[in-house]
């Protein structure tokens, strides 16, 4: 498991992402890129577009 903080864990092979509201969520990709909206994330090597709804290379 991955410890995001003292109270939050994510499964191995995922990435901890901190939302703008201070809530942790698990991105289902190892070394994922967390989007600013606090909901979405992208695979390693991709980044979020300005709407945080699409991943760009």
UniProtKB/Swiss-Prot annotation:
SUPFAM superfamilies on file: Granulin repeat (SSF57277)
GO cellular component, one term: extracellular space
Source organism, top-level taxon: Eukaryota
Subcellular location: Secreted
Keywords for the protein's UniProt record, in alphabetical order: Cytokine, Disulfide bond, Secreted
PTM summary: Granulins are disulfide bridged.
Broad class of where this protein is predominantly found: secreted
A single GO molecular function term of this UniProt record: cytokine activity
Reported tissue expression: Ubiquitous.
Disulfide bonds: 4-16, 10-26
Short name of any one Pfam family annotated for the protein: Granulin
Function as written in the Swiss-Prot or TrEMBL entry: Granulins have possible cytokine-like activity. They may play a role in inflammation, wound repair, and tissue remodeling.
Alphabetized PANTHER family for the sequence: GRANULIN, PROGRANULIN
Family: Belongs to the granulin family.
The protein, known as: Granulin-1
